[in-house]
Amino acid sequence: MKTNGFTLLEVLIALVIFSFGLLALAALMAKGLQYNTSALHRSYASTQAYDIADRMRANRLGITAGNYDAISGTGTDPGCITTGCTPAQMAQYDGWAWNSANAALLPSGSGSVTTDGTTYTITVTWDDDRDGAADDNFVFQLQP
């Protein structure tokens, strides 16, 4: 019985099996990184929702006047921070600063605030899988 090359064949088979194991390990690491990034984005979204809620609580007159009833998009900076803002200007600044931070922290990040009269709904939306469509969101309700 000739066994020439049999050991080489065993080594090649072991190498193929080992290669599949390494590929599976690499896929596991990539998936773990994806889940970690997703959790980070959700944490940022939660922090951002609480940020605008705190800004709203700090500007009671702005809430009473309805200045926070429909925040969406990036808005504009009213330029009054150094000179003193009215409650309406402060609400405008809060919306601008908040959505600027959403865009900086989250991929395709944006936020909106809506109300049904007594309850404010704060929504932070971002593109979690980076396919171009903002498809993940964090919703928080606030009753000031």
What are the roles of these predicted feature ranges?
Residues 13, 37-39, 46-144:
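Flexible, low-complexity segments enriched in proline/glycine/serine and punctuated by aromatic residues
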Residues 2-50:
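Aliphatic-rich helix starts adjacent to a transmembrane/signal segment
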